[in-house]
């Protein structure tokens, strides 16, 4: 599986520990890359060039158009809590249906809400 990620740690209402996610992904032999461009990573998921993407601290303008394209292409999308409405959340998981369950499990392992 090939996945991508993006992180920002400013002004968040949750704690995310990416190292826990990386350790679990290693057990699934997942290759993780960081392009630095959220919108491109989302579109790569839609095109089948990536199996998944997850990120937190994401800005709406970085993800909005890509989310629509990914949904239209059949990707599954949720926030780190499992809620499918990612338009109101700055953290999200996008993946092909085949990889979504495993990727979500790994990402959620490092997520804790402060609320």
What is each of the regions a protein language model found here?
Residues 1-115:
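An extended, acidic
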